[in-house]
Amino acid sequence: MTVRETFRRTKIVATIGPATSSPDMIRQLIEAGATTFRLNFSHGTHTDHHRSICNIRQVSSELNQPVGILQDLQGPKIRLGVFKDGPITLNKGDKFTLTSRQVAGTSEISCITYDTLAEEVPKGAVIMLDDGKVEMVVEDVNVELGDLYCRVVIGGTLSNNKGVNFPNVHLLVSAVTEKDREDLRFGLSEGVDWVALSFVCTPEDVLEVKDLIAASGRNASVIAKIEKHEAIANMEAILSVCDGVMVARGDLGVEIPAEDVPIAQKQLIKTANRLGIPVITATQMLDSMVSNPRATRAEISDVANAIIDGTDAVMLSNETAVGKYPILAVETMARIAVRIEKEQDLKMQPIESMGRAIPNAISQAVGRIAMQLQAAAIVTLTKTGSTARNVSKFRPPIPILAVTPNVQVARRLQMVWGVQPLVLVSLPSARQNFEAALNLAQEMKLLTAGDLVVMSAGTLQDVAGSTDLVKVEFVSSVVGKGLSIGSGIVHGRARVAFHHLDVRDFNQGEILVIDRTDADFIEVIRKASAVITEEASLESHAVVIGRRLGIPVLVGVKNATGFIRDGEPLSINFNKGMIYSGSRTDDLAF
């Protein structure tokens, strides 16, 4: 089967917790399909998270597969205090006091982790506790004591530190707490790839975190978690300044009516797709798999519909953090994604308000060319990830191989729909980088000889969003290998010689292919871009002269003069000692 037939485009974010923090479990999660790991800083110590990060990086390196790490900051989550006699049960009609005073919890009162509670929550406000399992209404307020006197509308059980939400009440709490700042400093020092900001209300919340990251001298992308009613109202402005977005349906389903959550999810996904930023759909996607080996039909439909809506990634929380079946949960999610993508009528997505931006036009053209030519893959050269993201946002049905010299960029691209990142040392020219990318893709079994690929890049080095080049190319095959004397990638026409008279018309830049050389070949070697010899000695005449003239030599290539045809175009990767058959290239420069 081709890479196009087996490639999974939807990414999977798995939360690391006590059930999955060991190297062996992390390895199994990656092999099952996880592409990014989430660390929830509402739980665990810095020591715990450091250990998890080290394990993730170690396993990722061993598997030679870039894997992203997402640091999820706790944010200003408002919680109950501790109940002195354990969990309490409240019934409809019961009176209950919430206070900012530090008191031990009882069946009649509990402290709450918000100092200006009584000043900001008005009489008549609805309060949701423990994700809406318990509901109260404020009947009276005592600002001096900091008390809210409430009546229970929906009863239930409450225990220590459960969350408290105030739908339709605008609280003046900052989105970044002191704990978040401390956790952020730690995460940046550990090299996390993404920082998720909880309870975002305004674009200024996102910009505050971006400023903190910039001031640290580190580099991480910011995901805005949409879980407040204010964030829904400010959706466009928030998504315009963040690097990614998470549809955090848990708190969002308490902040707004639950029946509005699917509509908000679709709006968020559509907006993120238009802006070209990755979107994660999260919370209770396969929640029953915390304790059961099979997902419910409703959960499977939930994951499927998020993929159909256009989400870049789907996320597992408790399922992998503390669940009994973390590997099965990832495998289930991966199977759903593959099945839905196979069934979907994958086609290029029109983007509204695209404007006249050249990178957008080129990226859309790349996808259309790839579709028309039925290409095996789209190959993008990208140093910042911008080129790959631009192509991805048009949702081409062709796999996108994103080649980058930056391993952190590769890890971030593991959140982007349809993108397979490849890490490759940057070479001097786009042509050399393209050739090296195709060689690597063949070694990874992503492409085979004869595949047609469409490639894109920016001709301006190190400038994000400068995509302006399209190439159509057939993948060449490996024809031989030897021992390299030199480095880099060389292209040229092969000239096979058995005698120096065979190459009297040798042209500058051609590749000399010969059993062995002698003094009669010195002037030919001087013109050559490279020399291939069957002779294996590192002290041979070709090696000595090649070193003296600065000409790379590939030695010990068995029967080179037999299997290489005179005049055949070749590419030699001296970094790996590999010879590739020539390729046909059409360049479309804009």
Region locations from a protein language model:
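Expand to "…catalyze enediolate/carbanion chemistry for C-C bond making/breaking, isomerization
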Residues: M1-P23, I30, T45-D48, C54, ...
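Conserved alpha/beta-domain cores
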Residues: T6, A14-P18, V169-L275, V279-T283, ...
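Structural preference for beta-strand elements that scaffold enzyme active sites
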Residues: K11-V13, T36-R38, P66-L70, K95, ...
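Conserved, mostly hydrophobic/aromatic
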Residues: T15, N40, D72, G124, ...
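Glycine-rich phosphate-binding active-site loops on the catalytic face of alpha/beta enzymes
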Residues: I16-P18, T35-H46, A196-F199, V245-I256, ...
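Glycine-enriched alpha-helix->loop->beta-strand junction motifs that scaffold or abut catalytic
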Residues: E31-T36, S189-D193, I213-R218, S240-V245, ...
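Acidic, glycine-rich flexible loop/linker segments
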Residues: P76-T177, L440, L446-L501, D505, ...
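ATP-dependent carboxylate/acyl-activation modules
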Residues: D94-K95, E236, I269-N273, I280, ...
